[in-house]
Amino acid sequence: METKDRGYFAPANAREWFERRSYSHKEFKDVAKLARRKRELGLTVSLVLPSRNVADTVGGIVEEATALNEEAPLVDQILVIDADSADGTAEVAAARGAEVYSENELLSHYGDAHGKGDAMWRSLSVARGDLVMFADADTKDFLPQFVYGTLGPIISVPSVRFVKGAFRRPFKSSEGLELDGGGRVTELTTKPLFNLFYPELTGFVQPLAGEFVADKELFSSIPFLTGYAVETGIMIDVYKKVGLEAMAQVDLGTRQNRHQPLFDLGKMSYAVLRAVARRLREDGRLRQVRDPSTPDSLFQFSDYLHAVATPEGLKLREHVEELVERPPIAEVLAGSRD
């Protein structure tokens, strides 16, 4: 399948963008051709895997990326940013040839890392590639197309600076496999919020996908929210920075990763909601959402209360998480050189 260079355009809405900026991994299956184009452009690529207790999957992902490189040199650096996992994640990744760092050793003067988003932000301090691609480290049956498909549009189409992976998300339960039952936070929280407040972004099939790539200059110019708010914040901030015309998505097929308990999905949804509300507040589109005399849930610690019925009776569980925003890494690294 021949890739169409759809060039620069200013989309009038999400529908037009969807038609012009949606690709398939099949368009880039000629990996030798893609690698030649990468070489002609003088580009280097860092693949970053934020990891926490994924010893059962991270090794296979590193092996797949390495094997793809033997066929076509698309990835110049494989980085695993480990959350001091207790299951040997770091050792497994290092044994497969990845460059491994503890998330807490990078930019350590910022204190201990606050979850996935912080690990991704800190990775930019050691990522050497002109392009930085992130991928989830808990993906089962990781396929080469997750790498070359994600990289395809940003290497092949000059006006594209950000690419988001898209895929079907199966959900496996005791009743069998539901082909599109995964991605519950995306379907029940993110997409309704984007339809309401950021309709330009509603053409993205998987806005929270962990597989995405941008040029390092772009990633370095935007702030990163910590924890599970990171993907939502990046989507909004990239859109505001470069516009919809520089963003694309690519169909990667089917992907299956770990499924979170319902309570954890609630916390993830809360993080997405806080990220959207925070950006709306900064843009002057949202007033204070709590009593002014109480701590601001968008900028400080916030209690997430979860009432449940259990065999032992009714329980009120509490989760406290700080929503931290790290500054653009370019500012941090520039300051360290002064």
Describe each region flagged by the PLM.
Residues 1-64:
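N-proximal low-complexity "stem/linker" segments adjacent to membrane-targeting elements
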Residues 1-21, 260-338:
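Terminal low-complexity segments of carbohydrate-biosynthetic enzymes
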Residues 44-46, 77, 238:
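Cell-envelope/extracellular polymer assembly enzymes that use nucleotide-activated donors
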Residues 63-75:
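Short, acidic, metal-binding catalytic loop of nucleotide-sugar glycosyltransferases
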Residues 142-168:
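Conserved donor-nucleotide/metal-binding helix-loop-beta segment in metal-dependent transferases, i.e.
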Residues 161-181:
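Short beta-strand-to-loop element that shapes/binds the nucleotide-sugar donor at the catalytic cleft/hinge
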